[in-house]
Amino acid sequence: MKANAAIPASSPAMQSPLDADDALFFLSRTGFSPAPADVARVVGMTRAQIVADTLGSVRREPVTTWPDWIAEPPPTRAQRQALTPDMRRDEQRERNRRYDELRAAWVNEMVVTPSPLTERMTLFWHGHFTSGQDKVPYPQTMAAQNALFRREALGNFGTLLHAVAKDPAMLQYLDGASNRKGRPNENFAREVMELFTLGEGHYTQVDVTEAARAMTGWTIDPDTLRFEVRPDTHDAGEKTILGETGPFDGDGFLDILLKRPGTARFIAAKLWREFVSDTPDPGALDTVADRFRASGYDIRAALAALWSTDAFWDPRNRGVLVKSPAEFVVGSVRLFDVAYGDPQMLANTVRTLGQNLFYPPNVKGWPGGALWINSTTLLSRKQFVEQLFRATETAGMRVPAHPMAPPPNARTHAMPVADMASAAGMRGTPARPARGGLRFDLERWLAQYRARPQAIAGLSTELQLQHAVLQLSPVAAIDTDSTGSAYLEALLMDPAYQLK
């Protein structure tokens, strides 16, 4: 994929070379917490070069193998109607199991991918164009939507918007499948304006009613659950939407939204809150939105403009965003090259921390930000750190059991650790995963800083460890006579580790 087309002309500031802190900041903000070798690889690049490198390495397909059942067609309407109550309960249990397996597959992809930005943006669109397990019964449908978000993660927003409007998961989740002439359902029409494009206050109830008429006839086949258009249920009459009049269908309605300058600004503001800070700078935001719209809604162009703002690189905006549960768990695993047997335990931890993938709390998705942290989730985050250190194996030590480990006879999914290490630029022999559990080779990781788990770290090593894992100085005082293991664990327990 070409990167240069989306990159604006560089300002002098964008020619500044990255030091280690800059590299850690950029890779953490645009992906997940990076391994030390990832940071070392980009130190010395200019800001413009790292932006181009990151946008030029995005993917459209996963690198991991996903469950075979994703390709299975759902049962037909006749097959569903023929189920007995006992069969329905069994089918429900199987669907729930498959949803869990789907969550595990996605978390595994987040850990292994050589393009963390791809998965961050896939996750971003999952929270933006919300659909969920509570109204989408078959996980195959949600898997197809996830694949759509990955394919178009950094493509064209207009293309993505049109595709999402015809996506079977979305048609089920926002009741678009039941929208027909004479009985319009306004759910999707309202949410596409309020949550997906314009934002609150930029449309009227009349616009919602008319837009719903335009969307009539877009539904799903009851047997295949695939998108289809039914002309006999479409309202072909004239509609007036946001001041424009015509016999619009669903595509015509979406094109009206894409012509509105407010759509580019709404998406740019949401990207700002994802990658820069909770409060966008109005002038800089206008610049990003203008470039986004002028590019024809090229998502890479929006990100290139965003990451070229002074605000993005301003040291005052470092460590001001809270890591989502997925970022916290996946970032920790990537940062410390943690091996694992079954990715289900990682997906379960993400859910425990408050982000149940494929099951957002409501149509607005996860609120995010500071709301990720409360007394319960903070305790769970600390317990995950403790779990990592219980999974430590140094010379003469064995990996202990932990509460999330499945029984010994459980099926395990061995992560391709060697592939991950290669992608991350790690040298040496990768750690072997404990069966069904985690394995953190602390001794090998600390050796990068000439430290040992049971030896006193010393001031120089302590400073190196701080800069390797934190965006800010630790909030709490840490005993300067700590061993390497104790000091690193204290850093991960510090509030600063929750931030990016």
How would you name each of these model-derived features?
Residues 3-36, 264, 268-295, 304-500:
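Flexible, low-complexity segments enriched for small/polar residues
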Residues 40-46, 227-229, 350:
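Short linear loop/turn motifs
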Residues 2-9, 82-87, 95, 99-106, ...:
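Active-site substrate-binding loop specific to GH73 endo-beta-N-acetylglucosaminidase modules
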Residues 31, 59, 129, 133, ...:
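Short alpha-helix boundary/capping elements
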